[in-house]
């Protein structure tokens, strides 16, 4: 019976993903033993000659994207593994900046299914092994791995990184990673390796990160100590032990993440020209990260879902020229710090359009309204989006935020209507 249910290499990607979601008894099962065994069988523990691994509460995706952009501009063949995806599963694996066809993913899943035998794998472990297998097939120069959760026990940590990066430390996933910044810092520093650079972009670094670096013999490089940056209205400068780079173009991604990516790149020893650095920084962009998708009304997508990200988003919103009102379409997961996240956004949002998110982790619209005092509730993200767009005047701003899921739902609605001709 099990063989009948198991998809084949030619099965649709949707069939595989449904199979993977129900394969393991737990959605999250931190630990490296099972996934390491299967990786060894597949021969994917060294997916490329050079590997960056990027952990952090916020900023992982844009740090990875900046590294990818610069390295591609320098002529390297690059693969990136990131999560979660916004609209399509195939977003999780990029080779030379492009998604791979669904058939490549299903072929890799079939390889893993064959190799795993009776070893049980979570959805994320399966996806990580799949990415590593796809990278190995692509014969890349550099692979960039974005940690899923934490670091020490995350499936990506089966690979020994040549450069490890921790972008930021804030309270999120406390059920899994510990109740405070010190505990979370220790987990994230678990990706450090002996005699290898360990780049930290968090300006208020928990002491546990230094402890782990010392225990492992990693080469710690901290923002504000071994490297730093400064910003003006029209450009920025970066400095480290190698010297100073001046008049850099302002990035489209958050400034601290672009600087952290540059610190990691300069510590890597990989040969990259100053022109490639400039071109890569100027062109790095990632969907759903303060993404302005239209004007009149201005529409902004941002996946901010914890207080640290909401603080950054609030700053970006305040920097925009304000003519009309700000209407926020928001849905969140109930295991996030809803009160702390909304406390930041309240200062820049005039009207709230609250929606529930599906699934056991989704917060209800009413749970969001408890923290807001005023606002409208809707039965779905699509309804909240439609209402906000109907109410918005040309001079207003519609902000879609609160979760990857919220932004993804709105993107899907827009895509469906576009393709349906509505």
Curated annotation (Swiss-Prot):
| EC number(s) on file | 6.3.2.12, 6.3.2.17
UniProt-annotated binding residues for Mg(2+) 2: 173
- Name the keywords, alphabetized: ATP-binding, Folate biosynthesis, Ligase, Magnesium, Metal-binding, Nucleotide-binding, One-carbon metabolism
Keyword Metal-binding listed? The answer is yes
Which residues hold 7,8-dihydropteroate? 29-31, 122-125, 153-155
Function noted in UniProt: Functions in two distinct reactions of the de novo folate biosynthetic pathway. Catalyzes the addition of a glutamate residue to dihydropteroate (7,8-dihydropteroate or H2Pte) to form dihydrofolate (7,8-dihydrofolate monoglutamate or H2Pte-Glu). Also catalyzes successive additions of L-glutamate to tetrahydrofolate or 10-formyltetrahydrofolate or 5,10-methylenetetrahydrofolate, leading to folylpolyglutamate derivatives.
- Name of the protein in its database record: Dihydrofolate synthase/folylpolyglutamate synthase
**What does UniProt list as this organism's lineage?**
Bacteria, Pseudomonadati, Pseudomonadota, Gammaproteobacteria, Enterobacterales
